[in-house]
């Protein structure tokens, strides 16, 4: 129905008077959807078990501090000092199960008290929740991506930081944790914390082996796949994955084997996939290797010139209009499918971007190493819980694709904040019944009731 201009235009321009009163008003009414999830997961009790070995018994338990950090990140805040802006919010206090929130100084002192045993137990809890989700999902093929991420800081007093390779902030001290992510669910399975002055492969063998063994022990019927970039390439890593029966693709650095350049330059016939990609494969082994593997040589047509420093006639083939990459794999499928499978690693970069920008994963909150590790783990848990919320309430959108795209269509945490979490509401007790009143927006009503009804059916 068409409306007239008189019905649309408002002439009210007066700025209202502002008053501040203590009322039962919340700015985060949408947190009620996480209340049901936290109850089903028994998150408070399980976090309490992670700190049960600590002898200190503060008024605010360490598990409450960890849960407070998770909610803090779910709401989109970054610095600890930002807690002052919602400490009187009744919905946040109900979700945490407290009558008042801890002071910022209390939170920072609690983070300083955390030890490595507590961090390790939280890592175990994170892995357990991911494995429980994978077991319920019933996925027969599981893809693991491994990569490191740099967390920079401007301060020099952060324990465990070091100056290392940092493309964006040269000379800055940083951490360089190594992550294991699950492609099908878009969750972080585990993280290996490291200082910023180590190579990507530092500690990678033990971490990769531990992740694979834990998943295989919990899900022995699942076919495991691994994707890695050239920083993890080595004869030892390739042999380990092949010996364990893990399907893998690894990028091969040209600098390791001068023969690769000759194989590409001597090749006359390339199998074409489309106007951009062409490739060929062969069974080959370097001189010091004892076993032959399948190497896939890829040529990409591109208009952009190679702008990095080059050493002609040494390692990297230089052809105008093309870029070259090499993969090593033990997969038996066609070259096109191997290429698309490896290119699916791009979803992990998107995941890291979401973790940094929306879960504040890269923020270094305190001076103590264990406190910063706790902050990192709460950021990971906030992300994983957001994915768990959607997987419990939504149906799968697709099966296993060539790129191993997540089988659910996930909304980003920022989208959930804007659509659901950051909504005004009022707590009232009509006839003695606790009620949360929210504005009657049709889109909000539909989404909010969808989540609440899903938890009622599960109960």
Which residues fall in each region the model found?
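Dynamic "connector" segments at or just before major functional cores
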Residues: 1-172, 176-199, 203-218, 241-244, ...
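An anionic, glycine-rich sequence signature occurring as long contiguous blocks
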Residues: 2-16, 20, 247-357, 447-459
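Short amphipathic alpha-helical "interface-anchor" segments enriched in bulky aromatics
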Residues: 37, 83, 88, 335-369, ...
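Structural preference for beta-strand elements that scaffold enzyme active sites
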Residues: 141-145, 223-227, 247-249
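Short, glycine-/Ser/Thr-/acidic-enriched flexible segments
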Residues: 149-151, 187, 194-196, 253-255, ...
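Acidic, metal-coordinating catalytic cores used for nucleic-acid/nucleotide bond scission
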Residues: 226-234, 254-257
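Catalytic cores of alpha/beta
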Residues: 235-239
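Basic, amphipathic alpha-helical segments enriched in Lys/Arg and hydrophobic/aromatic residues
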Residues: 361-394, 398-434, 438
């Amino acid at each position: 129905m068409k409306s007239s201009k008189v019905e649309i235009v408002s002439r009210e321009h007066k700025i209202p008077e502002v008053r501040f009163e203590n009322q039962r008003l919340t700015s985060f009414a949408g947190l009620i959807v996480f209340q049901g999830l936290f109850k089903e997961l028994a998150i408070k009790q399980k976090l309490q078990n992670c700190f049960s070995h600590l002898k200190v018994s503060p008024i605010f338990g360490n598990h409450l501090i960890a849960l407070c950090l998770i909610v803090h990140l779910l709401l989109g805040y970054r610095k600890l000092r930002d807690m002052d802006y919602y400490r009187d919010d009744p919905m946040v206090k109900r979700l945490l199960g407290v009558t008042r929130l801890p002071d910022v100084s209390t939170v920072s002192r609690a983070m300083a008290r955390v030890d490595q045993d507590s961090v390790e137990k939280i890592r175990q809890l994170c892995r357990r929740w991911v494995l429980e989700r994978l077991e319920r999902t019933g996925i027969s093929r599981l893809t693991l991506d491994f990569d490191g991420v740099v967390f920079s800081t401007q301060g020099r007093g952060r324990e465990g930081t070091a100056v290392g390779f940092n493309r964006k902030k040269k000379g800055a001290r940083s951490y360089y944790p190594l992550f294991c992510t699950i492609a099908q669910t878009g969750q972080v399975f585990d993280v290996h914390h490291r200082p910023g002055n180590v190579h990507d492969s530092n500690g990678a063998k033990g971490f990769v082996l531990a992740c694979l063994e834990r998943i295989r022990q919990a899900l022995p019927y699942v076919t495991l796949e691994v994707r890695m970039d050239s920083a993890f390439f080595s004869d030892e890593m390739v042999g380990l994955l092949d010996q364990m029966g893990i399907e893998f693709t690894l990028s091969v650095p040209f600098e390791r084997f001068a023969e690769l350049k000759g194989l590409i330059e001597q090749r006359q016939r390339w199998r074409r996939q489309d106007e951009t990609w062409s490739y060929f494969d062969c069974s080959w082994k370097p001189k010091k290797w004892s076993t032959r593997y399948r190497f896939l040589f890829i040529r990409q047509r591109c208009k952009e010139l190679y702008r990095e420093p080059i050493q002609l006639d040494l390692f990297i083939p230089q052809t105008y209009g093309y870029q070259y990459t090499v993969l090593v794999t033990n997969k038996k499928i066609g070259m096109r499918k191997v290429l698309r499978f490896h290119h699916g690693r791009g979803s992990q970069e998107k995941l890291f971007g979401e973790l940094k920008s929306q879960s504040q994963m890269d923020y270094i909150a305190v001076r103590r190493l264990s406190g910063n590790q706790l902050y990192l783990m709460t950021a990971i848990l906030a992300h994983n819980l957001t994915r768990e919320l959607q997987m419990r309430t939504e149906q799968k959108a697709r099966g296993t694709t060539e790129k191993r795209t997540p089988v659910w269509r996930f909304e980003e945490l920022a989208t959930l904040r804007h659509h659901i979490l950051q909504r005004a509401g009022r707590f009232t007790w009509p006839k003695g019944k606790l009620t949360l009143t929210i504005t009657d927006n049709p889109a909000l009503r539909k989404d909010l009731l969808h989540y609440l009804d899903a938890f009622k059916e599960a109960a």
